[in-house]
Amino acid sequence: MSKLYLMSLGCNKNLVDSEIMLGRLSAYELCDEPSKADVIIVNTCGFIDSAKKESINAILDLHEQRKKDSLLVVTGCLMQRYREELMKELPEVDLFTGVGDYERIDEMILKKTNLFSNSTYLQSENSKRIITGSNSHAFIKIAEGCNQKCSFCAIPSFKGKLKSREISSIIAELKDLVARGYKDFSFIAQDTSSYLFDKGEKDGLIRLIDEVEKIKGIRAARILYLYPTSASEALIKRIIASEIFVNYFDMPLQHISDNMLKIMKRGANSTRLKEMLNLMKSAPNSFLRTGFIVGHPGESEADFEELCEFVKDFGFDRVSVFAYSKEEDTTAFDMEQVPFKVINKRLKIIEKIVDEVIEKSFEKEVGQKRLVVCTGESSEGEFFIAAKDLRWDREIDGEILINESECGNLEMGQIYECEILQNLDKKLLAKALRKVDAN
C-alpha cells in the first residue's frame, strides 16, 4: 500500500479541507514520517506574512526529507493567492492546486496534473472526511468565502464571495458523524453569522441551530468566528437559550476605538460592540474569545491606549493579538504605514496585558465544577489525563489535567463532571467526580 504524509497549516477551516482530501485518499496508508511517504501533501495558509513564510519553509523542508520518486503536492490558500509566482519559484514541487479541487485530489495525483478551478470548493453531504485529532470532536464548515470588506484582509480576493452550504447538507454530515461516535462540534466559516445571507436569509444561523438541536446524540456545540455586524441580538439570545450550543462566544473584534473601527471598515462602532459583548457576558457560564490587530495604518497612540484599557477591563476569557501584516489586494496596503518599531513596541505592551487577562480567567475556574471531555494523555505525561472544558474549542482554549478520579478509570471521549482544584501556569488541575451520560 502506498504511503501518504499530509501537513495541514493555518486555521481549522484548512483542517477540514485536509480531512476531505484524506477521505479521497483513503486507499493510502497514513504515515508520520515524510521520508517514508510516496505522496506528500502540504495544505498551505496564505493569510498573513508569517503564515506565508511558514508554508514556504514547510514545503522546502519536506522536499529535503522526501524519498526519491515521491510526489510533493502543494495546495491551499497560499497556492490560490500566488499561483503564478510559486509555480515559477518552487521547482521542488511536483503538483500544484488551489482551493477549488480538494475532492479531485485523487484524480490529480493519479494523472499527475495541476488543477486550478475558478470557484472555491464547497463541501457537500457526499464529501467523505477522515476526522483527525479527536475521536469525539469535529469541525463543521458551514460556508466558504466572505462578503465583508475589512481593510486589512485579503481573504475575499482568493476565497471569493460568501457561499453557504445547504442546511440539509450540514445536517446529513452531522448525523453521519454522530453515528460514527462524534458528539462535540465546532461550527466554522470565515464569517459564521452571515450564514445563508447569500441566499437572502438573515436568520440562517438561527434556523441551523434549530435543526441541529433535533439530532439525538450531540452533547455540545459551539459557533466560532461571529462577525460584529452580521451577529444579531436574536442570534446571541438563541445561543443562550440552546441546550446543545454552549455559551461560547468567539467574535474577533480587531479593535475598539471608533476611529480604528471606521478605518478598518468593520461596520460597527464601539457602542454596538460593547452592547453585544455585554449580552454575551450575561449568559450563564459564558466564555468569551476575541482577537485584535495592533499597528494597523491610522492607529494613533490614543487609539492603542483605548484598546489596552478595554482589554484590561472587560474580562475576556481568551484573547489573541496580532501585529498588522501589510497584504496585497487590501485597502490598507496603500495607506501610510505605522513604523515597524512602533508596531513591535505596542505588541509587547498588549501581549503583557493579554497574559494577565487570560491568567485571571484561568484563576477564576478554581473551585468550579465543570463538565469536561477526556482527550487522551496530557502534555505533562502519563500521570495526568488530558481533558477540555465542554465549553471550549479543541486545543486553542487550554488543557485540563486530571490526576484524581472518584469514578474509576476514565474513558477517552467520555464526559465527566470535574472539580477544578488548581491553576498551574494556565493549566487546570482537576478531580473527576462522576461520569455524565451522553444525551
From Swiss-Prot:
It is an enzyme of class 2 (transferase). It catalyses: L-aspartate(89)-[ribosomal protein uS12]-hydrogen + (sulfur carrier)-SH + AH2 + 2 S-adenosyl-L-methionine = 3-methylsulfanyl-L-aspartate(89)-[ribosomal protein uS12]-hydrogen + (sulfur carrier)-H + 5'-deoxyadenosine + L-methionine + A + S-adenosyl-L-homocysteine + 2 H(+). It comes from the Bacteria. Keywords: 4Fe-4S, Cytoplasm, Iron, Iron-sulfur, Metal-binding, S-adenosyl-L-methionine, Transferase. Its cofactor is [4Fe-4S] cluster. Belongs to the methylthiotransferase family. RimO subfamily. Catalyzes the methylthiolation of an aspartic acid residue of ribosomal protein uS12. This is Ribosomal protein uS12 methylthiotransferase RimO. The gene is rimO.
